[in-house]
């Protein structure tokens, strides 16, 4: 796993020998932060590549293929999302997409690793001014602890974390889901990325099962994401009486999205028979 100097390539190896790779021009930056190994590459055809502990986090060209489905389905399904919490997302892409919604009055982003924010600010323009937006509040802290201790309440909670293995497993635990449920306002929505159903099957099913113990409804959908082992999975938790299968198309028109199509929101729930049967057994 990692950078191959002879091939001028970065390859991320997933379980069972599945790999996703990019030809790279150069390594722009690397460091060991307090929490993880951070690398940044310039690829031949996809812009900059952000890597944390050997795992691809962001591909600059096409990053909307991840950030749009993570943010807009829940934001458009909620009738009036005013207060939003983002856990993770240090590159700023999720914050950027959240702040495109005019209903948002406050968006709090909690990122544990300040170096991810700084490298993203210096080398990339993914945030596109989101960090400076007066509605945004950046907190450098552990998202698990923040959620446990905060008195704030939110309409939408978005978890933009690393894969559901290793240290990030805490973000996929029943206890974490319960804290999130408690910090949602009545009729709130929660979403997390959840890895590849084909390569992180057990981890995803565990999260789906534990969310089902906590939230009033749980929805699964997947989306092709550039740079990830697609299709990539997302899990949505509903608190109260919100129909996640219906989105506000009038608000959606103002966004001019590139990847996620609100007019075909219902297609998110069309999944392969294999996946549907897996979820039905949970």
UniProtKB/Swiss-Prot annotation:
Record-level GO cellular component terms: cytoplasm
UniProt pathway: Amine and polyamine biosynthesis; spermidine biosynthesis; spermidine from putrescine: step 1/1
Pfam families named in the record: Spermine_synt_N, Spermine_synth
Annotated residues for binding of S-methyl-5'-thioadenosine: 36, 111, 142-143, 167
Keywords: Cytoplasm, Polyamine biosynthesis, Spermidine biosynthesis, Transferase
Reactions accelerated catalytically: S-adenosyl 3-(methylsulfanyl)propylamine + putrescine = S-methyl-5'-thioadenosine + spermidine + H(+)
EC number: 2.5.1.16
Gene3D superfamilies linked: Spermidine synthase, tetramerisation domain, Vaccinia Virus protein VP39
Positions of the catalytic residues: 160 (proton acceptor)
Residues that, per the record, bind spermidine: 67, 91, 160-163
Cell location: Cytoplasm
Role noted for this protein: Catalyzes the irreversible transfer of a propylamine group from the amino donor S-adenosylmethioninamine (decarboxy-AdoMet) to putrescine (1,4-diaminobutane) to yield spermidine.
Assembly and interaction partners: Homodimer or homotetramer.
Protein name (database record): Polyamine aminopropyltransferase
Species whose genome carries this gene: Thermococcus onnurineus (strain NA1)
């Amino acid at each position: 796993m990692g950078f191959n100097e002879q091939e001028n390539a970065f390859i991320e190896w997933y379980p069972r020998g599945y790999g996703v790779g990019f030809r790279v021009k150069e390594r722009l930056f690397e460091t060991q932060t307090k929490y993880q190994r951070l690398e940044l590459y310039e690829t031949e055809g996809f812009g900059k590549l952000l890597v944390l502990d050997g795992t691809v986090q962001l591909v600059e060209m096409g990053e909307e293929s991840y950030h749009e489905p993570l943010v807009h389905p829940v934001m458009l399904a909620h009738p009036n999302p005013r207060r939003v919490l983002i856990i993770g997302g240090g590159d700023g892409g999720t914050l950027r997409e959240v702040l495109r919604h005019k209903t948002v009055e406050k968006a709090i982003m909690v990122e544990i690793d300040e170096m991810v924010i700084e490298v993203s600010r210096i080398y990339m323009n993914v945030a596109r001014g989101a960090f400076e937006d007066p509605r945004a509040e950046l907190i450098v802290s552990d998202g698990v602890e923040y959620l446990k201790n905060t008195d704030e309440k939110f309409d939408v909670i978005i978890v933009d974390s690393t894969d559901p293995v290793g240290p990030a497993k805490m973000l996929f635990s029943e206890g974490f889901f319960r804290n999130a449920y408690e910090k949602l306002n009545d009729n709130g929505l929660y979403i997390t990325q959840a890895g590849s159903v084909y390569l992180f099957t057990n981890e995803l099913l565990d999260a789906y099962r534990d969310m089902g113990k906590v939230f009033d409804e749980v929805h699964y959908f997947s989306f092709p994401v550039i740079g990830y082992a697609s299709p990539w999975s997302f899990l949505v938790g509903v608190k109260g009486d919100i129909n996640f299968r219906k989105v506000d198309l009038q608000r959606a028109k103002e966004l001019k999205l590139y990847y996620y199509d609100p007019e075909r929101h219902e297609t998110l729930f069309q999944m392969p028979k294999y996946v549907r049967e897996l979820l039905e057994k949970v």
